[in-house]
Design a protein with these regions (language model features):
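Donor nucleotide-sugar binding/catalytic pocket of nucleotide-sugar-dependent glycosyltransferases
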Residues: 127-128, 132-182, 189
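A short, well-ordered alpha-helix in the C-terminal region of glycosyltransferases
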Residues: 249, 323, 330, 337-351
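Aromatic "clamp/platform" in nucleotide-sugar-dependent glycosyltransferases that forms part
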Residues: 276
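Conserved acidic donor-binding segment of nucleotide-sugar-dependent glycosyltransferases
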Residues: 308-310, 314-321, 330-335
Length: 377
């Protein structure tokens, strides 16, 4: 988007990867993202003055420098509202009379919310006010998010769908040059085997145990399951594999550098993504770009836009291991079906790319500013 002549933009970072910030399992994979993230666009690191810097806490980011940055541009886009710094930017823009676009990937409100039911009730009241009254427009990454906001009373005309994307060209390039046979030799998996890949943190909300149990119940000959990731459930998952009697067909790879991840997808045949709380789910994008279909739970936001049943994958009820096992037992033996779905998956991603994201975002900014011309923001 930074190369688009319609906009002059600055990205402000209120935090950078730091051990002091990442103190929970949700951020255990930050060290494996080994691609340059600061090239090709103008950005600024804003000093954080929080006495207790930490992600996931409202006062973990206190960056008053955002106020001056907002003052220098025509429009302000804020992705989220969970930190005091974000509210500084929002309030500065409103006081200065500048359009404010807010971004959210929320797809539902957890009624339990870590044992704090009052937060769920508060959000049901906050979201309509925030997105109907405070924001000029709301940016969402998926149809799932759009439907959720509409269900809370946010007006549809105030919502702009800006596709959640990865670097399609980079991933496709790695996949095209990948040596499938060599990667499988590394895994100790036969070249004629059918491979299911699970790629996520081993956290309760990701439900990795469902992938193991469904794979075991499917009982497909010459099939293998790659568990790519790590996390608090790692030991219990290995114990589960032994209990299920599938240790000879399951591989745990640990965390994988992002620069190699496309090789892993390219050497696989289908992605399984079992999360119960996944506002979007970028592994679905990554897998489909590499030419493999995705089987996802109905709590994965990406499923609404990318998974076309029988063409680019399947959607099953979250937690229904039998339903997932049935899909695996039907799909894994059918190599022609997997190949065809893989080709359709790759084709689908040609219209869900950074180009579509940039176009949608710029259109939203122009709409918020009430004009169809170049914008500085």
């Amino acid at each position: 988007m930074a190369q688009d002549p319609r906009v002059e933009m600055l990205t402000a970072y209120c935090s950078f990867p730091d051990a002091k910030l990442y103190r929970d399992p949700e951020h255990l994979n930050k060290g494996v993202f080994d691609l340059p993230m600061l090239d090709g666009y103008e950005w600024r690191r804003v000093a954080n003055y929080s006495p207790s810097p930490r992600l996931g806490r409202f006062y973990g980011l206190i960056n008053p420098g955002v106020i001056k940055l907002v003052a220098g541009y025509d429009c302000c886009v804020v992705y989220g509202h969970a930190y005091i710094s974000f509210w500084m930017a929002i309030c500065a823009a409103k006081l200065l009379g500048k359009p404010v676009l807010l971004g959210t990937d929320a797809t539902y409100i957890d009624p339990h919310n870590g044992g704090r039911a009052w937060k769920a009730s508060a959000k049901k009241m906050l979201f309509p006010f925030l997105y109907n009254r405070v924001a000029d427009l709301v940016l969402v990454p998926s149809t799932a998010s759009k439907r959720f906001l509409c269900s809370l009373g946010v007006r549809e005309e105030r919502i702009a769908l800006t596709p959640y994307v990865v670097d399609n060209a980079y991933i496709a390039g790695i996949a095209a040059g990948a040596d499938r046979k060599k990667t499988r030799e590394e895994w100790q998996v036969p070249d004629d085997g059918v491979v299911v890949i699970f790629c996520a943190k081993f956290l309760p909300r990701k439900r990795p145990q469902d992938a193991l149990r469904a794979f075991a119940r499917a009982k497909v000959e010459n099939s293998y399951l790659m568990m790519v990731g790590d996390g608090p459930l790692a030991d219990s998952l290995r114990e589960e594999v032994a209990r299920l009697g599938i240790a000879d067909r399951v591989r745990f790879t640990g965390l994988v550098k992002y620069s190699r991840l496309a090789e892993f997808y390219a050497a696989s045949d289908v992605l399984v993504f079992t999360s119960e709380h996944e506002p979007y789910g970028l592994p679905v994008n990554e897998a489909m770009i590499c030419g493999i279909p995705a089987i996802v739970s109905d709590r994965v936001g990406a499923g609404y836009d990318l998974v076309d049943t029988g063409r680019t994958g399947f959607v099953y009820p979250c937690g229904d291991v039998d339903a997932l096992a049935t899909i695996l037992s039907q799909v894994l033996p059918d190599r022609e079906l997997l190949k065809r779905m893989g080709e359709q998956s790759r084709a689908r991603m040609k219209t869900w790319s950074p180009r579509e994201n940039a176009d949608a975002t710029i259109r939203a900014v122009e709409k918020a500013m009430g004009k169809e011309q170049s914008a500085k923001g």
